[in-house]
Amino acid sequence: MAGWSILELLRSNPEALKEHVRKRLMDPAIVDRAYRLDVEWRRLLTMVNEVRRRHNEITRMIAKAGSREERERLIAEAKRLLREREDLEEKLKKVEREREEALLGLPNIVAPDVPVGDESATRPIEFWGKPKVWKGHVDAFREQTEAYGFKVDHEVIEWRPRGHADMMEEVLKLGDTLRAARVAGSRFYYLFEDLVFLDLALLMYAIDFMTSKGYVLVLPPYMLRYNVMSRVIDLETFKDAIYEIAGEDLYLIATAEHPLAALYYNSEIYDEDLPLKLVGVSPCFRKEAGAGNRDLKGIFRVHQFHKVEQFVYSLPEESSKLHEELISNAKEIFKGLEIPFRVVNIASGDLGACAVKKYDLEAWMPAQGKYREMVSASNCTDWQAYRLGIRLVRRKGMERGYVHTLNATAVASTRTITAILENFQDEEGVVAIPRALRRYLEVFKRAPTDAIHPRRRPPA
């Protein structure tokens, strides 16, 4: 039976696991603690089993005792062994709790082709499209392309594009973050009319694209219990990012990845049913507590948004190939939207606990003169599956192990809207609608057909 890869590495080569932890810029002492507790747990478990075996043996001997003295001696020994077993079991329970906590605190390993370092070590691996680059951003553009050895064809424009926040609120007058802040706080928003239609069209476009590739469409729960959420992610690390429902054992999901990963909680999946490819659609709720003052304007970094999420349960030997498929799907989606982008290989120190490797797809934002994250695609191998108790059963030999899980954004609606507002505007403030979205707008009588035009006043 195949065990959890991290536990096997902890037992066979703890120094190698420490090196993976160091690559993530984490304290390797967590490996020492987990190793020590695992050794102690196995020692106590062996002792409990031995005392239990001896107690059962003595119990059988009592019935066969030849004299009263021998019977009383055996009964006394059985009572002593029972007390010893109870004491050992109490110690075992305590160590088992500490061991489980320590094991759940261990991150995944790091794939060999992941750049090592903090976020500055992240490296672009691919560029697509012909970005519009304002003349004042040409040097910054070259630092994000040529500095990494890529020569990216681009169009230099004389006029300065307006940021998505100004486009949304001042030019198109189809969004209002100030009134949202008065009633809900910062990082909330009202969207109106054409931008709402655009949000819906993006979701339908991504759903249509993913289901046409055979992914099963899922509308998941928007909340999860603590004992589930804490196993999908390292909740202690991310507790400031997740909303907890006061007085309830429930947490709002930050992405459909969370309930999709939990779909087979404490269950088995047979190898013949893999890969299981899902696409979830849901609202997402995020505190963004660590964002500080970044992206306060507009709707790039907000507390709630809609997202279409790719998720795959995989055989271990197929997860690397499927990781490439997930990022390929995202690339096709953004190529269809005609939004210039680059794909980056995320550095080890910025992976988070669960991924062995992560790609981000970043869209070019002409007003900012930067590539900004739109998509994350992660291979979590068996890290989530072990925590969630999702076992793989191979029919041949009925061998058991753990499935691999992978996830990737298809479309996050508000972020993608920001990219459309910046990439598809003209000097007059008119925003062309990507051609791939237009057929999804035809079902709405009042939706725009080919462009969104500036307004003199907001609709509400």
UniProtKB/Swiss-Prot annotation:
Entry similarity comment: Belongs to the class-II aminoacyl-tRNA synthetase family. Type-1 seryl-tRNA synthetase subfamily.
A GO CC annotation given for this chain: cytoplasm
Gene Ontology BP terms: selenocysteine biosynthetic process; seryl-tRNA aminoacylation
Name of the top EC class for this enzyme: ligase
SUPFAM superfamilies reported in the protein's UniProt record: Class II aaRS and biotin synthetases, tRNA-binding arm
First-listed, main subcellular location of the protein, grouped into a coarse class: cytoplasm
PANTHER family in the cross-refs: SERYL-TRNA SYNTHETASE
Domain remarks: Consists of two distinct domains, a catalytic core and a N-terminal extension that is involved in tRNA binding.
Amino-acid positions noted as binding ATP in the UniProt annotation, renumbered to this chain: 286-288, 302, 373-376
Protein name: Serine--tRNA ligase
Keywords: Aminoacyl-tRNA synthetase, ATP-binding, Cytoplasm, Ligase, Nucleotide-binding, Protein biosynthesis
